[in-house]
């Protein structure tokens, strides 16, 4: 078992994940719950963003990261991330200048996109994933196997919740989200 030693308290453990079809079915839901906020960024902040704009973006990213960590913790689960968890076939975007961004390099250095990992609620890599997903550099989703639930942070500063068990999970998630000012949860239906 490979253990990555830079991130988190318990570190990421490489795992052999077998429930790929179960996960893929969740992405075909006609309606999902979404954790969203009062503010919105499309792909992060602009290259010429002021320090105030960056501060605002990162404070929001931190709120979302804390909510996601709290969901993993409150549900008493570990999250699976990696090559078999994701709506997109690629886990990283393809920008020519990606390697000039520290946030991307920090994630790419520790995350092998050809593997799956089990992470705990307190693993610091969650912060890097949220930042990179919000900035449109990565497309890494979190799967909680006990509840057959996917948490997908998007480049639109929101987290989609895919599940077959909304009745069982949503009230607890609403309580978690409600503890963070400026964030809320809503239901979206797709055509």
Residue ranges and their predicted role:
Residues 1-158, 163-191:
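Structured alpha/beta or helical-core interaction and ligand-binding surfaces enriched in interleaved
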């Amino acid at each position: 078992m490979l253990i990555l030693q830079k991130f988190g308290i318990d570190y990421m453990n490489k795992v052999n994940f077998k429930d790929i079809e179960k996960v893929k079915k969740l992405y075909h839901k006609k309606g999902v719950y979404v954790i969203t906020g009062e503010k919105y960024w499309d792909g992060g902040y602009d290259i010429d963003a002021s320090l105030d704009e960056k501060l605002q973006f990162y404070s929001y990213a931190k709120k979302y990261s804390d909510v996601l960590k709290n969901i993993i913790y409150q549900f008493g689960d570990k999250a699976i991330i990696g090559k078999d968890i994701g709506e997109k076939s690629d886990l990283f975007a393809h920008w020519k200048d990606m390697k000039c961004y520290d946030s991307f390099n920090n994630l790419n250095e520790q995350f092998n996109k050809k593997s799956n990992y089990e992470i705990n609620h307190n693993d610091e890599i969650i912060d890097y994933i949220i930042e990179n997903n919000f900035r449109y550099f990565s497309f890494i989703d979190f799967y909680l196997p006990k509840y057959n639930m996917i948490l997908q942070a998007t480049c639109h500063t929101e987290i989609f919740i895919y599940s077959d068990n909304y009745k069982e999970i949503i009230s607890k998630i609403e309580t978690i989200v409600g503890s963070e000012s400026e964030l809320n949860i809503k239901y979206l239906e797709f055509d």
